[in-house]
């Protein structure tokens, strides 16, 4: 789905999903990872808060004749009692949440084996000169280190690695 990217290739390789495994892709968007994962594993649960994104996943699902994809219309703040557990959890670029502790609890309750999270390493997605040009403060987002520190405080020793994107930034 979409154009090939180094980020996508590196993340899929790192995940090393096996044919007998299930995957929960949280914040799946249009199916960037859902489709290639469904082609290599037992089942994929595609979770997104946007019905429009899930509609796109449905279109790709039909186009590629993949019957092992289940769509879940949820957000991080919803009740996840009916979200199935999966061997592998992926939350790619979808970890900027209001309640980090709730997110971590949901990940822990749904993951059977492994969790892959990606987060920004830069405080924002725009060039710093943009903020100066428009006369606004460069406030930005919390970076990956906030997430790593919170995991550590909860006794989770995350294995952290970086993927350089086409823009030269790391994720």
Predicted regions and their residues:
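Substrate-binding/catalytic lobe of Class I Rossmann-like enzymes that use SAM or dcSAM, i.e.
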Residues: 139-171
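Class I SAM-dependent methyltransferase SAM/SAH-binding core
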Residues: 32-67, 73-77
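Conserved class I S-adenosyl-L-methionine
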Residues: 1-16, 20-29
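Short conserved loop adjoining the S-adenosyl-L-methionine
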Residues: 78-83
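A short SAM/SAH-binding and catalytic strip from SAM-dependent methyltransferases
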Residues: 87-101
């Amino acid at each position: 789905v979409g154009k090939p990217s180094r980020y996508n290739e590196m993340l899929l390789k790192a995940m090393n999903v096996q044919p007998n495994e299930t995957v929960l892709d949280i914040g799946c968007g249009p199916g960037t990872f859902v489709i290639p994962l469904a082609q290599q594993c037992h089942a994929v649960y595609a979770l997104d808060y946007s019905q429009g994104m899930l509609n796109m996943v449905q279109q790709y699902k039909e186009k590629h004749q993949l019957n092992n994809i289940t769509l879940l219309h949820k957000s991080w703040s919803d009740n996840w009692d009916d979200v199935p557990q999966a061997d592998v959890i992926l939350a790619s670029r979808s970890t900027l949440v209001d309640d980090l502790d709730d997110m971590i609890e949901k990940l822990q309750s749904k993951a059977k084996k492994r969790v892959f999270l990606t987060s920004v390493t830069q405080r924002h997605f725009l060039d710093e000169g943009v903020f100066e040009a428009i006369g606004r403060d460069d406030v930005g987002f919390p970076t990956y280190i906030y997430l790593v520190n919170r995991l550590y405080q909860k006794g989770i020793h995350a294995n952290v690695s970086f993927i350089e994107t086409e823009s030269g930034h790391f994720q």
